[in-house]
Amino acid sequence: MSVSSFCNLTGKKVLVTGSSSGIGKAIAIELAQAGADVLIHYRKSKEAAEMVASQLQKLGRKSETLSADLACLENYESLLNQAFQTWGQLDIWVNNAGVDLLTGSEAKLDYGQKLEKLLDVDVRGTVLLSRAVGERMQQQGRGCILNIGWDQSDRGMEGASGELFSTSKNAIMGFSRSLEVSLAPQVRVNCIAPGWILTAWGENASDVWQERVKRETPMQCWGTPEDIAKMARFLCSDEAAYITGQVINVNGGAVR
């Protein structure tokens, strides 16, 4: 498959956490289409992860799968070591893995349990993995880290889910800005803040939520995982070489 010269990532070695489905999968595919070799991380969806890796291999890219439960602190070093051993280097690390409080098994947990899960996986995972991979990238003399936030975090959203996600995603967005200062100039760090993106929850959302998305979004439609992936491709490329420490909304111009 030919690769466009714009945002060309040929030869880049990448790991995307939580990339067996949804936004993570879309990012992995987009970066592979840009020429990158991509490691697919998953927690328990082995078959889905292997299907993504196979899809990337059909594009002519190298791709393997790595499993790690990011709720367990002891798995972090192992995941990082496996990634560097597989590629010999890592040019791009995307922290996409997160707890699904809306459609997954965690949806049945109480408020405190949900908060604990988010802090363990979304926040601690992003912070500690970013710092560890960032240190190695500094030693390489180059690298790019991309995190995933949420556009409503800094504006606020009603309800338990709004409170919980705002807590975790605001932490990630603030951390991204500070980590950039620590790792520059060798390593760039940015964060994408998605708006209403049509993933598993959105596909089954009620008519009330469907109308709310249209009402709050000037584009009057859901965004797609591919919309996030295209921004990820740009931010990971040399075309974004002077962009770091930024939290960029991809939300159809949503206002609330």
Describe each model-derived feature in a short phrase.
Residues 121-139, 153, 180-185, 237:
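Amphipathic alpha-helical dimer-interface segment in Rossmann-like NAD(P)H-dependent oxidoreductases
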Residues 91, 109-128, 142, 146, ...:
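Catalytic Tyr-X3-Lys loop
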Residues 184-188, 243-245:
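Short, small/polar-rich loop/turn modules that mediate ligand/substrate recognition or access, typified
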Residues 46, 67-79, 112, 226:
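The beta1-alpha1 cofactor-binding region of Rossmann-like NAD(H)/NADP(H)-dependent oxidoreductases
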Residues 77, 100-116, 158-164, 203-207:
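Conserved mid-core segment of classical short-chain dehydrogenase/reductases
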Residues 2-8, 100, 104, 211, ...:
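Short C-terminal tail/terminal secondary-structure segment
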Residues 99-100, 146-171, 176-184, 196-197:
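Catalytic loop of short-chain dehydrogenase/reductase
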